[in-house]
């Protein structure tokens, strides 16, 4: 690889932010970074959706094909953007390293934290922060399709809105189903019933899921095509 790529929160215009990529050529002395890719949209702090959170930003970069990299983008809490097929926020993108043109690989994402491509089986594995509960491990094995795979956010999630939920001393979610946030984002407890791809695994409560990678046979021969992922939080059993 001739370049170094760095993901940053970027002010595309005054008080309007997205997650973008800076790139620098390899150098043994110093690095000069320029803007390589910025999505076609940004989220204003004071927006008509009425919510903004800079931590819902995605920003994971991963190797993909010879001429492309993978990149995850968040919606900065403007949840509806994840279901807009013309908007590049709330997506996993394939970005051409020569032209910086992006193609939407999958949509319906909240906040992808881990991202890896397994070339042998042509699969993308990703991890995703849910809201209060509902952290996910997702598999996209439909990469040759013209239509992006849709993982359902914010229509479906196994978590709950922070404004409407709390954890009991035993670790169970206590939910206020009358919270008005559900009018904007219902978080149905099924993905497939609404035409979306189910997560391979999900965690309730959340575990603070983070990076993910696949194990290749030449590393551990008995674990070929296994995945390893990290967690920053609690140790709970997965479902799915």
List the predicted regions and their residue ranges:
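Acidic, Gly/Ser/Thr-rich repeat motifs that build Ca2+-stabilized beta-propeller blades
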Residues: 1-79, 114-117, 122-130, 205-240
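Beta-propeller domain segments
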Residues: 75-240
């Amino acid at each position: 690889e001739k370049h170094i790529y760095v993901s940053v929160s970027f002010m595309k215009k005054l008080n309007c932010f997205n997650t973008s990529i800076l790139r620098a050529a390899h150098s043994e002395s110093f690095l000069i970074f320029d803007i390589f890719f910025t999505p076609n949209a940004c989220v204003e702090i004071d927006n008509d959706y009425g919510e903004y959170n800079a931590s819902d930003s995605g920003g994971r970069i991963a190797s993909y094909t010879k001429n492309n990299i993978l990149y995850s983008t968040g919606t900065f809490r403007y949840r509806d953007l994840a279901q807009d097929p013309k908007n590049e926020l709330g997506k996993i993108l394939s970005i051409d390293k020569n032209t910086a043109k992006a193609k939407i690989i999958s949509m319906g994402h909240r906040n992808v934290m881990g991202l890896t491509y397994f070339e042998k089986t042509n699969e993308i594995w990703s991890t995703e922060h849910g809201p209060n509960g509902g952290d996910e491990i997702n598999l996209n094995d439909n990469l040759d399709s013209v239509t992006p795979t849709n993982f359902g956010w914010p229509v479906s999630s196994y978590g709950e809105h922070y404004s409407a939920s709390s954890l009991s001393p035993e670790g169970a979610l206590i939910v206020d189903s009358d919270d008005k946030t559900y009018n904007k984002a219902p978080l149905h407890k099924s993905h497939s019933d609404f035409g979306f791809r189910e997560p391979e695994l999900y965690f309730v409560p959340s575990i603070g899921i983070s990076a993910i990678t696949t194990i290749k046979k030449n590393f551990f021969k008995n674990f070929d095509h296994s995945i390893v992922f990290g967690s920053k939080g609690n140790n709970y059993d997965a479902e799915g």
